[in-house]
Amino acid sequence: MSPVPLKNAEPAHGGVRTVSVLGATGSIGDSTMDLIRAEPERYQVEALTGNANVAGLAKLAKEFSARFVAVADPARLGELRAALAGTDVACGAGESAVIEAAARPADWVMAAISGAAGLKPALAAVDRGTTVALANKECLVCAGDFFMSRATAAGAQILPADSEHNALFQALASGNRHELTRVIITASGGPFRTWAAADIEQATLAQALKHPNWSMGQKITIDSASMMNKGLEVIEASYLFALSPDEIDVLVHPQSIVHGLVEFADRSVVAQLGAPDMRIPIAHCLGFPDRITGRAAKLDLAKIGQLTFEAPDFTRFPGLRLAYDALRTGNGATTVYNAANEVAVAAFIAQKIRFGAIARLVEDTLNSWVRAGNQAPLGSADDAIALDQQARNLAATLLPQIAAKAS
Ligand code: NAD
Ligand code: MG
């Protein structure tokens, strides 16, 4: 008797995998290092980077015998050198050192810097034609179509590490592009899912940082509360899988167990499920095309009991609507969407604006940019970075009037 054939009879990967982790000191970095720590004989750590946490970075460098570490803050080189004294770990500081870390030879690179600051390092890895696990959605949103074209040109393989996109990536494998009718990414709805608009408007930083299911970095946690994160993810899905906005739906699913679903022409819907633990999509990327042993809890659906779903509310969460608008506008609008959101989130953290003003600042920045009529396709990383800077300046100009205006 022959069993039903499974995809690969033999593992595709033997031997040691060289890995680099950009943003090693963050939340995704931490989950990635946890998976590497579990099977140290499978991996050689090439390079690690962090922004300013020298002690954390040096600790990881020593534990994993990294060959090179980079801290983004150029003022911390002396501190990093001192922390690594007596080891043979090479080190550097500043943006160029982070880019150097990304460009060093590694079979697999985790791109987990937060924000558009991750774009140049991610591109440095992509340009080597290596495998890049992409957690840093802002870099994709900032670079637009251009990022994936550059990956294709370099022969790099992009593996989606964001949980929803990783779910889609897994589910998409069960059909062909022309058979796909739509994809659905789920959203927990965040801490304000059931709140009235007037209460969301006044939400405090502490309330925005209380995510019901996921433990993540500060920026993405605030983006989840505003649903800007889902907006960024709709754009991310569009660029990653070359989908039109009409082919991407969002479904609110408070339990965060079903992460993404793909609907095919025959009306089959294929979904990926798992505990809300980033180590699951990261493990998928780390092992790909094989599967490694995970570190997250096994899914116990009987214990969870109920999975519920609801339609997203584009009125209470205008950030989601704006993402579809930006995607339809194209020609750099998603770069502006991301940049304005980064400025707005920083202003909210600094308590310069109310929570409700985050989406207003993004909307005003987008409108003002569209009115100025400077839209053009992004042809290079420099175009994306220039537009990102232009949009940040525009958002900063609009910020005082948004801050002064009561809703
Ligand atoms: P985090 O804030 O915990 O970590 C960010 C990392 O980037 C840190 O190592 C930090 O030192 C580094 N960094 C920050 N600014 C930098 C700069 N200017 N230059 C160089 N390095 C810099 O964030 P996180 O939650 O780990 O998220 C990282 C990325 O992954 C984000 O793009 C986020 O949207 C995405 N993501 C995160 C999760 C999650 O569960 N945390 C899930 C999906 C996607
Ligand atoms: Mg996600």
Swiss-Prot record:
Binding site for 1-deoxy-D-xylulose 5-phosphate: 137, 163-164, 188, 211, 224, 229-230, 233
Name the record gives this protein: 1-deoxy-D-xylulose 5-phosphate reductoisomerase
E.C. no: 1.1.1.267
Binding site for NADPH: 25-28, 53, 136, 138, 217
Pfam families assigned: DXP_redisom_C, DXP_reductoisom, DXPR_C
UniProt binding sites for Mn(2+): 162, 164, 233
Annotated GO biological process: isopentenyl diphosphate biosynthetic process, methylerythritol 4-phosphate pathway involved in terpenoid biosynthetic process
Gene3D superfamilies in alphabetical order: 1.10.1740.10, NAD(P)-binding Rossmann-like Domain
Cofactor: Mg(2+); Mn(2+)
Keyword match Membrane: no
Catalytic activity reported: 2-C-methyl-D-erythritol 4-phosphate + NADP(+) = 1-deoxy-D-xylulose 5-phosphate + NADPH + H(+)
Domain of life: Bacteria
Its biological purpose: Catalyzes the NADPH-dependent rearrangement and reduction of 1-deoxy-D-xylulose-5-phosphate (DXP) to 2-C-methyl-D-erythritol 4-phosphate (MEP).
Keywords: Isoprene biosynthesis, Manganese, Metal-binding, NADP, Oxidoreductase
Record pathway: Isoprenoid biosynthesis; isopentenyl diphosphate biosynthesis via DXP pathway; isopentenyl diphosphate from 1-deoxy-D-xylulose 5-phosphate: step 1/6
Similarity comment: Belongs to the DXR family.
Gene source species: Rhodopseudomonas palustris (strain ATCC BAA-98 / CGA009)
Molecular functions (GO terms): 1-deoxy-D-xylulose-5-phosphate reductoisomerase activity; manganese ion binding; NADPH binding
